[in-house]
């Protein structure tokens, strides 16, 4: 490692040049990486709802649709608007009454099913827009944006495709502010905690490289989710800031011991790499545990963040030293007093009251651990969006005027007879919460020659060997009521056609709930096991990994239990990923604390003295790192209009503070009290002479 460090210091100008040049392909890769705004596409492809979604898309071209509620618009204007919409690139068809019969025929003369389906309250009628591509495709997004401009007054545009386009527009609008807020808040903490005014700017400049490289290399993944895109910069900034702080502190210590700055930096690089190798590996392992999720959104977040941490480590020991040495004179020239102190008084208090602190903590932990299991989550991510968005307003309007709170798409094989389909529709109509059931056979009636219907109608109701049945529900997606409804409907369908499936937002969300519940358990287990293994190998200990992981898991339990007491519902994805993120991001603090405690014991200090010295000397680094992580994420939580991102960032920021408090107050006390157990379960913890000396003292 020393030869590598010498090469880094010697070739620092070349390194900076190459690092800057690499920003160019990174920018190209970042721009070319597609962003996916549809969370439901991350469901396992073998689920019935996803199989049905493929059939809807490939055979019926209905996987991406939009519904327009039109109130009080004269027929001639409505038909003119229909033609304008059909002219938009990316639109396959705009379906309305005029595609079936002459719109001048009085509505009273129409079949009851058509009346109920096409006409609603408030003198409203409905148009269905079919798009060429999937809901989250760029073509569909562009088409939705164009249609919004074409719509007349008192037209309400709803459906999945519209909401996804709204999400994209909102993210693109807010993303620059997320980054500015995270960087600005982090700089404030760094200016207050670091002596040099220039150092925080160097840190941010140094983090620009791994963040840019991370986004640029996402091109090899093909696409990333909008959640990953929104969180990656903030998380990478907060998580990898530790490494920069550790390098700086090591460099400052080595400058006092070495004859010149270059020798000091070589030594600092070697010692930093040694100290951050375990912590970075645990962080990477924590994020990679998300890959155990069947919901592949976890793999998306996990790979991007693990890659970001790895790039952060490389840039910390390669690019940042070159920056610090280049601007070393300016760093020394512009200095000020720091605000964040060493916690000397607290260190004596903790070491003097270790048993009391641990006992109180364990008692306080119990209600939070119980509350964590009872915290409510929601799965309808559209509820996390501002309710004044075009797609949300339009979708709510469909529920008000047509009773289409949720629409189920049922696919059965076309070899079922008209009477079988009709009987099935009657059964489905009897299910609680179903407001209407529409199929080709229920509209035409028995004996009707379907060849008389226009192709545009047939394509919607029968295609690719399947018949489509549309069932509208008054129940909201993601609720127990609609999940029970779907189970009852599925029983009816399987009795007639064992290969029949239900798809649509309601069915996919039900599958999402079932998958997420399993994922939650898997992710927690894998992340804990991975971190335990790495800490075990690093410290060659059985007890230390359990102690450190237990400390962070206790902090996570407190963090996840608080929403129960405040009556706050969490988005399901937050409940799955927050434990892994908090464990991976803050286990560094516990490793730093334990490493220092080991050093103090090796110097011959008693457990009490070692705990006091450890807390005093580690407090500034942990406070700086923890407060920076808190500032970066709480700023985003404060400004985001998306409740999903707001909730995740708030949990992360609060988790950083709780983990920081537990590591600073509880862990030193726990290390001190379990010192005997640690010695018996750790290889080469203390040499015999040191142990005897300590025990005599």
Where is each model-derived feature located?
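Structured non-transmembrane domains adjacent to transmembrane bundles in polytopic membrane proteins
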Residues: 44-161, 376-378, 382-544, 550-569
């Amino acid at each position: 490692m020393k030869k590598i460090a010498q090469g880094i210091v010697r070739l620092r100008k070349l390194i900076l040049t190459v690092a800057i040049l690499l920003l160019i392909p990174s920018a190209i890769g970042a721009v070319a990486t597609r962003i996916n705004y549809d969370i439901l596409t991350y469901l396992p492809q073998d689920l019935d709802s996803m199989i049905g979604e493929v059939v809807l898309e490939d055979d019926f071209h209905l996987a991406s649709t939009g519904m327009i509620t039109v109130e009080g618009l004269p027929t001639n204007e409505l038909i003119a608007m229909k033609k304008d919409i059909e002219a938009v690139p990316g639109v396959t068809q705009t379906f309305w009454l005029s595609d079936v019969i002459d719109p001048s025929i009085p509505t009273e003369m129409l079949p009851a099913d058509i009346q109920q389906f096409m006409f609603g309250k408030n003198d409203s009628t409905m148009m269905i827009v079919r798009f060429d591509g999937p809901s989250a495709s760029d073509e569909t997004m562009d088409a939705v944006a164009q249609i919004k401009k074409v719509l007349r007054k008192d037209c309400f545009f709803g459906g999945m495709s519209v909401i996804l386009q709204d999400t994209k527009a909102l993210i693109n609008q807010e993303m620059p502010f997320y980054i500015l807020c995270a960087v600005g808040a982090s700089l404030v903490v760094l200016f207050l905690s670091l002596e040099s005014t220039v150092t925080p700017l160097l840190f941010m400049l140094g983090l620009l490289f791994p963040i840019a490289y991370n986004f640029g290399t996402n091109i090899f993944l093909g696409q990333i989710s909008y959640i990953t895109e929104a969180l990656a910069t903030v998380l990478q900034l907060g998580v990898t800031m530790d490494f920069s702080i550790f390098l700086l502190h090591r460099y400052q210590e080595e400058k006092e011991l070495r004859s010149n700055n270059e020798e000091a930096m070589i030594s600092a690089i070697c010692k930093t790499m040694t100290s951050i190798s375990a912590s970075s590996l645990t962080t990477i392992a924590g994020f990679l545990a998300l890959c155990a999720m069947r919901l592949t959104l976890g793999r998306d977040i996990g790979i991007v963040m693990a890659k970001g941490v790895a790039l952060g480590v490389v840039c910390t020991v390669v690019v940042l030293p070159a920056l610090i040495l280049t601007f070393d004179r300016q760093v020394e020239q512009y200095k000020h007093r720091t605000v964040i102190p060493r916690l000397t008084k607290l260190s004596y208090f903790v070491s003097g009251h270790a048993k009391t602190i641990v006992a109180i903590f364990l008692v306080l932990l119990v209600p939070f651990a119980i509350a964590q299991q009872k915290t409510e989550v929601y799965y309808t991510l559209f509820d996390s969006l501002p309710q004044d968005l075009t797609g949300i307003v339009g979708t709510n309007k469909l529920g008000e005027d047509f009773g289409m709170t949720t629409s189920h798409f049922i696919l059965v094989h076309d070899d079922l007879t008209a009477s079988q389909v009709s009987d099935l529709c009657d059964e489905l109509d009897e299910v609680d919460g179903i407001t209407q059931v529409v199929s080709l056979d229920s509209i035409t009636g028995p004996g009707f020659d379907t060849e008389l219907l226009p192709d545009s109608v047939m394509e919607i109701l029968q295609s690719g060997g399947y018949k489509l049945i549309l069932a509208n529900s008054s129940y909201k997606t993601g609720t127990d009521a609609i999940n029970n409804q779907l189970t009852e409907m599925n029983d009816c369908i399987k009795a007639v056609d064992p290969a029949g499936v239900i798809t649509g937002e309601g069915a996919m969300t039900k599958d999402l709930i079932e998958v997420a519940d399993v994922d939650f358990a898997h992710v927690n287990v894998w992340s804990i096991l991975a971190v335990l293994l790495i800490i075990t190998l690093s410290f060659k200990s059985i007890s230390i990994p359990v102690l450190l992981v237990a400390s962070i898991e206790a902090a996570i339990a407190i963090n996840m239990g608080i929403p129960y007491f405040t009556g706050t519902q969490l988005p399901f994805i937050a409940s799955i990923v927050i434990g892994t993120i908090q464990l991976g991001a803050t286990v560094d603090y516990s490793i730093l604390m334990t490493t220092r405690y080991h050093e103090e014991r090796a110097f011959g200090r008693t457990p009490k003295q070692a705990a006091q010295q450890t807390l005093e000397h580690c407090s500034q680094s942990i406070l700086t790192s923890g407060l920076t992580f808190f500032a970066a994420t709480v700023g985003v939580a404060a400004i985001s209009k998306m409740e999903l991102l707001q909730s995740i960032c708030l949990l992360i920021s609060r988790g950083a503070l709780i983990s920081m408090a537990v590591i600073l107050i509880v862990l030193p006390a726990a290390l001190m009290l379990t010192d005997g157990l640690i010695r018996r379960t750790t290889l080469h913890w203390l040499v015999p002479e040191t142990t005897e000396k300590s025990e005599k003292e």
